[in-house]
Amino acid sequence: MGAGRAVPRAPREPGLRPGSRPLRTAPPDPAGPFSYSGGVQELHDTALAPLTTFRLGGPADRLITATTDDEVIAAVREADDSGTPLLLIGGGSNLVIGDKGFAGTALRIATRGFELDGTRLELAAGEVWTDAVARTVEARLAGIECLAGIPGSAGATPIQNVGAYGQEVSSTITEVIAYDRESRETVTMSNAECAFSYRHSRFKGDPERFVVLRVRFELEDAAGLSAPLRYAETARMLGVGPGDRVPVDAARETVLKLRSGKGMVLDPEDHDTWSAGSFFTNPILTREEFAAFHARVVERLGDGVVPPAYPADDENTKTSAAWLIDKSGFTKGYGTGPARISTKHTLALTNRGGATTEDLLALAREVVAGVHEAFGITLVNEPVTVGVSL
């Protein structure tokens, strides 16, 4: 199957390998903003804010909650057949929804399923990501332990090519099971066909086409040790060097401590976590762009200041969005309104309670303009915007 198009596979139960056990399922979290006993739930003129980690966003004309793959597909087909705009919601940790809400059907994917067969892992799209990571660590498997604490659902991870602390899901995902709205078939896409890149994928590049149903991973049995540590701060906290391995549970716990210290682990009592985590991606610059950027750094900050630089590939260099924001004068806690920069991490924009989406966007635009004025770099938002834009 070429990278240009997903080809329908022969009909079979979606997401199961021949001879594998069915996914163990569990009902959605009863502590969530909408509780129900199973099956499709339909609500009308319902606020979407409780379904996002920003706690922002107006109402949807209709909100459907689906707990099985068949329910997800049926809801998508119904919307497509009627020409109704469709918004997919998983954990809501990467969404910025406009104050006017969504004029269409919002589909909350609340499927559950965790299947571990040796080192092969299969997750239903609605599976809570942090729980799944914890269970793989309990099984002493390596590969996603440094992605602990990232809010949201498993189905969102390939879309964004979620990554943190030296790991990206693209390094362990083998296949993604998705519903193709164009062919109206369930398709199985290989890692290569997902076209992963930094915080991007084929799914993000063509958001109207695919609905992720299940995600398959190949993890590593390293006798209870982690994957080689790629993030210097993690290695330093563990007293080892980059490239070393440590007990997999120690790697996870260290990442959780790092994330908590930056307000990146959800806590309803901590407004620093009323966010989407990192609001901007780290810029990737060509050699010419980096040279121009470095000249601006010297001009603004002096010869002794060296900007962060990490090889993105053979031709390009990645720099730090958080560093750019800070050096442009936007410090931790910046802002006077109900939307402010986190008090723990300059890369997170937060709702301090009572904010509107427009408050958040005004802050984001101010940061983007300030960084561009200071260094000539235009930051790009990481969360998906719905009904609004920067």
Residue map of PLM features:
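Compositionally biased, low-complexity flexible segments
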Residues: 1-33
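N-terminal low-complexity, intrinsically disordered patches enriched in charged
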Residues: 11-15, 21, 101, 135, ...
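Anion-binding (especially nucleotide phosphate/pyrophosphate-binding) glycine-rich loop
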Residues: 36-183
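Phosphate/pyrophosphate- and phosphate-bearing ligand-binding catalytic cores of soluble enzymes
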Residues: 43, 50-53, 186-349, 354-358, ...
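Residue-level signal for inorganic ion chemistry
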Residues: 68, 92, 152, 184, ...
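Generic structural marker for isolated residues within well-ordered, non-membrane alpha-helices
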Residues: 132-133, 321, 368
